[in-house]
Amino acid sequence: MILDDIVGVKKKELEIRKESKPLKDIVDELSRIDEFKIRNFKGALINDDISIIGEIKRASPSKGIIDRKFEFEDICSTYETLDIDAVSVLTEQHYFKGKDEYLKKAKEFISKPVLRKDFIVDEYQVYESKLLGADAVLLIVRILKENLDKFYKIASSIGLQCIVEVHNKSELDIALKIEPEIIGINNRNLENFTVDLKNTENLINYMPENTAVISESGIKTSMDFKYIKSLPINGVLIGEGLMKKIYDIESIKKFIDSVKSG
């Protein structure tokens, strides 16, 4: 299964990272930084209109390479000028061709809140995310299970907000036990990467009133947006739909306008 492969590679990668830079060194480095410019990710989702999280994504297991040029600074410049509310940056190296450096640069070039999008399997990555400049991290229930509460508390203790990601009702039940501020409903099944937009509709009615809800994955056409906007959600995460238009500023602005206008 794809998710098992990703997690396996991530754990091996972390063994090397920890040898190169132990967790203690990261914590010590964090303690020496006087001030972090943390931006309010949840605040960016609380709007009268639907909020848009634009994702910077070079590749994916299902689509392969999405952007062969991947002129990162140009992408950041475009995202800064677009009418979007936050940015998600893929840092997973092997399957999504991301880099930690992309997160650091995005925080430098973009004034909007920045999410580190990766497959967090170890508390090391939570502290690392803070050091890289993330405002929020993604915690995937299917990966973390009983460790979800622990990782959520660690992130909160160092000033990071979390998107707690679920795909089905059993995962949502686990998530709701920790009363998260933000829940992401992934329309993509991480076991086989198939997509069903009905997933958001199936889970939305179980959400607590004060929880910000994001619909993730598979939102590409005007009909998709019209359908998703009919649901009581706060925001959408759009990756491929933006990245395929990223170098055509007029086209991408029309695309964003169509999402906002519904």
Curated annotation (Swiss-Prot):
State the Pfam families in the record: IGPS
Single GO MF annotation: phosphoribosylanthranilate isomerase activity
EC id: 4.1.1.48
The residue stretches assigned to a coiled coil in this entry are: none
State the superkingdom: Bacteria
Q: In which pathway does it act?
A: Amino-acid biosynthesis; L-tryptophan biosynthesis; L-tryptophan from chorismate: step 4/5
Q: What is this enzyme's catalytic activity, as reactions?
A: 1-(2-carboxyphenylamino)-1-deoxy-D-ribulose 5-phosphate + H(+) = (1S,2R)-1-C-(indol-3-yl)glycerol 3-phosphate + CO2 + H2O
UniProt entry keywords in alphabetical sequence: Amino-acid biosynthesis, Aromatic amino acid biosynthesis, Decarboxylase, Lyase, Tryptophan biosynthesis
- For whether the record's keyword set contains Amino-acid biosynthesis, the answer is yes
- GO BP of this protein: L-tryptophan biosynthetic process
The UniProt entry's sequence similarity note says: Belongs to the TrpC family.
Name the NCBIfam families for this protein.
Answer: PRK00278.2-4
Name assigned to this protein? Indole-3-glycerol phosphate synthase
Q: Which gene encodes it?
A: trpC
